[in-house]
Amino acid sequence: MRWIFYPAAIALAGYLAACGGGGTTITPPPPAGNFSNASLNGQYVFSMSGVDLNSGAYIARVGSFAADGQGHITAGLEDVLDLGSGSPASQLTFSNGTYQIQANGRGLIVLNVSSGGTLQLSTSLESSSQGYLVQSDGLASTSGSVELQKPLQFSANAINGKYVFDFSGISFAGSTPSVISLVGEFGADGNGNVTGGTADVNDSAFAPTGATALTASTYQLDTNGNGTNFGRGTMTLDGRTFAFYIVDNTRVELLEEDSLGGSSGPAILQTGVIPTQNSGFSGSFAFLTGGSQTTGNFGPIARVGRFTADGAGGIGTISFFENNDGNTTQVTPGSGISSTSYAIDTNSAGSGRGTFTFRNSSVGTVTYVFYLSSPTRAVIQDVSASVVTDGTMVSQSAASFTTAGLAGNYSFSWSGVELVAPSSFDENYVGQYAQTSAATSNITGVADYAQLGLNTINTNGVTLNAGISGTLTIAGDGTQNNTYKIVIGGPSAFTVNFVAYLGDGGTVLVVCSDGNRTTAGVATPQTQ
């Protein structure tokens, strides 16, 4: 997941300041695990977005590369959109490249551009089929994901069924560039036709649209060889033109390429029984969103929380944490929460669309739209006043969590903005850690991170192989407001404090609780 933080994506112009902290040196633990170069073997889609170093403008890339399992990249292709270049999206081919995957799943991928230059990516693999990425060549601050493709499904008929999508980026629809989030569901017939659907658009230049019907449109794979070789094609959706790369029949990664702006994100096949009325939706869920304020200083904002739906339109046991441009607010169950409800959209039955809302005197009225990709997962969009954010929602079926139950190896990805005068800058982290069952000092690992402004104090603003240590502290039954303290080594060691919410499958959703940054992200268990 990658969010668009307004000052970083539209008007970043400043310098990199020191992160603070002392001179603590953290020795990275020796790489341990079952990963190797053989873990990256096959064709992979990568999807990333963030900020261009030179212009401070939004940049996004989606592409595919082939890895041979022995440290070599044999071919690749990407679409890249840099709104600071003044040029439309371009296509780049990769003639070859190299990579190295350590035993802990961390690695470095270097893609050689056929026309000259390279793209360097740091990765932390969850498994041989997926992982997190951060651009680590100092040319841009982008982050995203890498996913194993199934080349036998590089055809139009692989895109067949209902797909939930979540795109974020920049819009040119208003008088000035604005942040935009698009979430929704569309149907595809496997024969090149988008049969319709429903979407919610939150463009900071306008009011949120609410549920809007999608008209029929088309999609097709490239016929010049890029379709069969890399799974590339194009799609028209909601009046916008996208390039896409097929992961498999369950997932497609898209990049907007038109005059309306630029956005990117996944489309995920709906599976399982999707509720069509309130009685079909119950249980506990944790959620995380990130994005931007749309008034005041237009600063970054990230929110994390949880709730329990009762199957009858009510929500309770609400807990919520917000970092609004470094100003933090925590809402606990029973702390003046009112006007609570949820609704499954019966006018768009079968779309997976729903809403939930609550009110608290500290944060006002908070309202979200979600689209379920399965009974336990959804994409989510914040439509509260004066914010544009989006993110993820996951079920929280466990009644309690413990450090013993969470012990294991994790990959993580955090993105956000460090808030320094006179101008803030974008930051991205990717890494791996081992968590023990101890109550304290239970995290040790390694991270690569990029903290890019227009001028940097570090070489390219990138630090590789920084040791990390810290503690995940479980609060009560662990369903809400846990703390997650990480000390990060490098040229100048620093500490980042997070509030952490836990979801099914060991998912850890975090938002920074410090006043000097608005950073959020996710950690997920490694399965190899």
Protein language model regions, located:
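Mature soluble binding/inhibitory domains
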Residues: 19-528
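Short, functionally important structural connectors and interaction interfaces within domains
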Residues: 8-11, 32
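Bacterial N-terminal signal peptides that target proteins for export
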Residues: 1-8
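Bacterial Sec-type N-terminal signal peptides, specifically the leucine/valine-rich hydrophobic h-region
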Residues: 13-16
